[in-house]
Amino acid sequence: MGSLGTMLRYPDDIYPLLKMKRAIEKAEKQIPPEPHWGFCYSMLHKVSRSFSLVIQQLNTELRNAVCVFYLVLRALDTVEDDTSIPTDEKVPILIAFHRHIYDTDWHYSCGTKEYKILMDQFHHVSAAFLELEKGYQEAIEEITRRMGAGMAKFICQEVETVDDYDEYCHYVAGLVGLGLSKLFLAAGSEVLTPDWEAISNSMGLFLQKTNIIRDYLEDINEIPKSRMFWPREIWGKYADKLEDLKYEENTNKSVQCLNEMVTNALMHIEDCLKYMVSLRDPSIFRFCAIPQIMAIGTLALCYNNEQVFRGVVKLRRGLTAKVIDRTKTMADVYGAFYDFSCMLKTKVDKNDPNASKTLNRLEAVQKLCRDAGVLQNRKSYVNDKGQPNSVFIIMVVILLAIVFAYLRAN
């Protein structure tokens, strides 16, 4: 759960945090008894607790398909991310990965920690995949094939232009959006709109660009070789080499570059909102909406923040818990996007080279949210000043003592 100091500063986080903790514990206790499914869900909890919690919203059949889809793509991503694998060995694996998912004898040892376990015991994922309905299998195979080919292409070339950046993000994340839409269709839960491919792609690009921005330092410090996803067309305006952005003497230029990257990501929000409006199934809606809200929140935190080049920048755990707890309808999504766009807007320096473009995109988002006519009576994500009075702090400490005693007893 969050630290005691943070919870005392943000007491409104406590109840959602407790609910999230109990939900995680419940999900961990519901591991299927079959060895292959047990491995898949246990691994899902290890590689992404937040995703494993959100996926619980789905019905069993669709949940199983999405779980396998996620782990297959995580395994593919593990191969791509392992910079110790020689290119002439990595590229054929990426290109052929969609065939390996049918082979319960196949595995390839790479990655570290839980990802190495995933790769070493990939036969469990293959066994689960082979139990899915044909429609799910075909969707997963197609997306894995296209993604592997795209990853292989960018192993051999750098991200030079913004078009390259969009193409790379399409391969590694936009295709995830398309694949999920195909799984929803195969489940009979959703009807695809005429522009479903474009807006599904935008859902993936918005999440991926947020991750690429947030993970700059981790990627640039990767050993034995840096991972570089920021397009030269953007960073080349501010530095001679991408790694120069992490040095303190370049902070002003680095932050300007960061702000342009965030501004680029904002262009996908209109499509994301359009996609979420089209969803009919409440569980699928929550599954899709929660990560999108966390992405706009992360961008608001990263914007104009030099800490992106110094360490880890992420939403506090209590705010994540609030997003999971509160996101139930499209009105909640509009409220969250409005709040976080307002937060981001207050951080825009009018002397920033891209200030005008940033403000225009934020104002367009705010107008979309206002025009929906559902912003009244919402609980704000950003107006909490985090300054509880001393009496309240004492009450919270007593409450926490009782809660922790209860949790230990159970």
Curated annotation (Swiss-Prot):
Cystine pairs: none
Pathway: Terpene metabolism; lanosterol biosynthesis; lanosterol from farnesyl diphosphate: step 1/3
Compartments, record wording: Endoplasmic reticulum membrane
EC code(s) of this entry: 2.5.1.21
Biological process (GO), any one: sterol biosynthetic process
Tissue and organ distribution: Expressed in all tissues analyzed (seedlings, cotyledons, inflorescences, siliques, leaves, stems and roots). Highly expressed in roots and pollen.
Catalyzed reactions per annotation: 2 (2E,6E)-farnesyl diphosphate + NADPH + H(+) = squalene + 2 diphosphate + NADP(+); 2 (2E,6E)-farnesyl diphosphate + NADH + H(+) = squalene + 2 diphosphate + NAD(+)
Superkingdom in the source lineage: Eukaryota
Major location (coarse): endoplasmic reticulum
Top EC group: transferase
InterPro entries: Isoprenoid_synthase_dom_sf (IPR008949), Squ/phyt_synthse (IPR002060), Squal_synth-like (IPR006449), Squalene/phytoene_synthase_CS (IPR019845), Trans_IPPS_euk-type (IPR044844), Trans_IPPS_HH (IPR033904)
Cofactor names: Mg(2+); Mn(2+)
Family under the similarity heading: Belongs to the phytoene/squalene synthase family.
Name of the protein described by the UniProt record: Squalene synthase 1
Gene (UniProt): SQS1
